[in-house]
Amino acid sequence: MITRRDFLTAAAAAATLAGTGLGGLGRLAAQQRLEEKDLLAFEPLGNVTLVHLTDIHAQLVPLHFREPSINIGVGSAKGRVPHLTGEAFRKQFRIADKSAEAFALTYDDFASLAANYGRMGGLDRIATIVKSIRAARGANMLLLDGGDTWTNSWTSLKTNGQDMVDVMATLRPDAMTGHWEFTLGDARVKELADKLGFPFLAQNVRDSEFEDRVFPARKMFDRGGVKVAVIGQAFPFTPIANPRWMIPKWTFGIREADLQKEVDDARAEGAGLVVLLSHNGFDVDVKVAEVVKGIVVILSGHT
């Protein structure tokens, strides 16, 4: 199960990208004394820094984003992260009411808090954060895009995803995977993926006729003296969640046996760190962590 420390670490990163923060950053924001240098403060730790972006949904500019009031967990997932909202979420993680983190992570009093804290997100702000981390870590950093990046805005619709591809190129990701990208159609996705300049990874996407892989499954990187294997896992239920006619030539699925083989092969090739860049969704990734052995880090998207 995810620990409180792990979750708050991830939440702090997300809140920082959104222009809010936890602890001291939250207090500065509440006092309207938050400056760019406070957001950019970064203490390098360890050999490798993983920077994970996911589910941008082609939103280029800051916006007001209200967390949902309902997130239903089924069976053993009921009442567990990420199926906690509002007061239950704040109680679980000891978040003060009306604080910056309460605004970023829960829905209560959203209108009044939004008037105080403002909009969230914006690719220009994300770019500033990424640039700062890259300056501190250099070749020891990996920037990984978890998908749901190219579509779901007016500009991405009008450009067939090209606007987001061009903008993301300025951030220089090392790899990505996908979900809503596939609604552009198989031909367009392949066209864009082949021109990215970095790998579109998806070990679980296959040609429906011959079961050949459509995309590379993994990529090995040398970072901080460590071989890092990044394995891509696209949204496994794409033909169910999205119109099947958009991707008639491809099949998906979790393909956990194939995933295990990718992990084993990466280890055999000397990987000291195996990262799953996933768009499974949190609940599926929890199960994957139980079933597939040898993965060290799962960067989870979709949920």
Region spans (language model):
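Acidic, metal/ion-coordinating pockets
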Residues: I2-T303
